[in-house]
Swiss-Prot record:
Protein name per its UniProtKB record: tRNA modification GTPase MnmE
Residues bound to Mg(2+): S229, T250
Lineage: Bacteria, Pseudomonadati, Pseudomonadota, Gammaproteobacteria, Alteromonadales
Entry's cofactor comment: Binds 1 potassium ion per subunit.
Residues reported to bind (6S)-5-formyl-5,6,7,8-tetrahydrofolate: R22, E79, K119, K453
Length: 453
């Protein structure tokens, strides 16, 4: 942990109405004495001159001093809030550096100091960057929930439950001569099942939070001339893709990034899937499958004039069999303007089926509502937390250890192995909040922050 005093511009570079210089560390009070001529009263706004070493006024503004540990970073912090001209701010930083023993902060270093001083955990620190980078109202709300500790609370509860169960299992191992067989009395199994159920709920919320942050990737797939490019244009609200009556017009991947009521959506239009000897088309089809395999959702586009079937296993079994087992599929029966089908949604064999006309726009609004629902629009209006991919990976790892532990208990009654899986689960969960996290990971996380944060 560094003990350096650091300085950086806390406001965005460039011209603005107000510019803020932030100093954190033991020398913050020395900077105040050198630049202001006095140490401001803690937590009081002090309007004063910011002076050079020769006594000339560089700027005028408000100085705020926070005595550690009662500050954002947990250290002494001085903020100089002056006019937002970049030249003035650069002069002020240069003046601060003249005090000696002070260096320019690295990206995210103020937040890193706050984390190191237990002022916030890692998910809260990440939420600061996510709040700054939010591209929608929903992302901002979710990031604020994480910043206020909602995600951390869920993870801490899981860690506590896993730790308590682990202690109970280890106690059962240490006292094998007791009359009660702790490993088979049902208490351990019931506690384990409750933890698994709780983790499933947190995983579901985290996945929604990740979609809010990163967007949901939706791939439009199907046979040539089913109307995939027309649907891309309808969802994007503009002519992004060339549409013709010639099958196989789209030979490469087309992407559009849109927002549905603040929810980010990445729409991928792909080449029509079919057997072909055309080398260029074969490459496009291979790329289409690459996109499908990494999608969050597939819109299976069907030309409604060619079949009355609604079950994808009936329409194209080979296509369905090749899809990843955990990939959600929505069936889109297109060209409803020609088939005369009612624009309704039905559930068929576990699949949502929509009838639309991508050409005329009929049914597209209902499809948008469906996509919003998949992204958790309503739940995020009510309040959710934001999550990153590393959080999802850690939760998945923890879930895997719980499932292995369940097997050790149910099949083998192996208490030692169950305890070890619980320990590994505990470590995976603790990495989310930063309780047990490598320095390399911390460096990677904080280096992505803005300078001055």
């Amino acid at each position: 942990m560094t003990t350096d005093t650091i300085v950086a511009q806390a406001t965005a570079p460039g011209r603005g109405g107000v510019g803020i210089i932030r100093i954190s560390g033991d020398k913050a009070s020395d900077v105040a004495m050198a630049v202001l001529g006095h140490l401001p009263k803690t937590r009081y706004a002090d309007y004063c001159d910011f002076k050079s070493a020769s006594g000339q006024v560089i700027d005028q503004g408000i100085a705020l001093f926070f005595k550690g540990p009662n500050s954002f970073t947990g250290e002494d912090v001085l903020e100089l809030q002056g006019h937002g001209g970049q030249i003035v701010l650069d002069m002020l930083i240069k003046r601060v550096m003249e005090v000696g023993g002070i260096r320019i902060a690295k990206p995210g270093e103020f937040s890193e100091q706050a984390f190191m001083n237990d002022k916030l955990d890692l998910t809260q620190a990440e939420a600061i960057a996510d709040l700054i980078d939010a591209t929608s109202e929903q992302a901002a709300k979710s990031a604020l929930q994480s910043l206020q500790g909602e995600f951390s609370k869920e993870v801490h509860e899981l860690v506590d439950q896993v730790t308590n169960l682990r202690l109970y299992v280890e106690a059962a191992i240490d006292f094998p001569d007791e009359e009660v067989d702790f490993l088979s009395d049902g208490k351990i199994a019931n506690a384990l099942y409750k933890i698994i159920d709780k983790l499933d709920l947190v995983q579901a919320s985290a996945k929604q939070g990740s979609i809010i942050r990163e967007g949901m990737k939706v791939v439009i797939a199907g046979r040539p001339n089913a109307g995939k490019s027309s649907l891309l244009n309808a969802l994007a609200g503009k002519e992004s893709a060339i549409v013709t009556e010639i099958a196989g017009t789209t030979r490469d991947v087309l992407r559009e990034h849109i927002h549905l009521d603040g929810m980010p959506l990445h729409i991928i239009d792909t080449a029509g899937l079919r057997d072909t000897n055309d080398t260029v088309e074969q490459i496009g089809i291979e790329r289409a499958w690459n996109e499908i395999n990494s999608a969050d959702r597939v819109l299976f586009m069907v030309d409604g004039t060619t079949t009355a079937a609604v079950d994808p296993h009936t329409i194209w079994p080979d296509f369905v069999d090749r899809l990843p087992s955990n990939l959600g599929v929505t069936v889109i029966r297109n060209k409803a303007d020609l088939t005369g089908e009612d624009l309704m949604m039905t559930e068929e064999q576990g699949y949502s089926v929509y009838r639309i006309s991508a050409k005329t726009g009929l049914g597209v609004e209902e499809l948008k509502q469906h996509l919003k629902s998949l992204m958790g629009y309503q739940s995020n209006l009510e309040g959710g937390f934001i999550a990153r991919r590393r959080h999802l990976e850690a939760l998945e790892l923890a879930a895997g250890h719980l499932q292995l532990g369940k097997e050790q208990l149910e099949v083998y009654l192996a208490g030692e192995l169950l305890a070890e899986e619980l320990r590994m689960c505990q470590l995976a969960l603790s990495e989310i909040t930063g309780r047990f996290t490598s320095d390399d990971l911390l460096g990677k996380i904080f280096s992505s922050f803005c300078i001055g944060k």
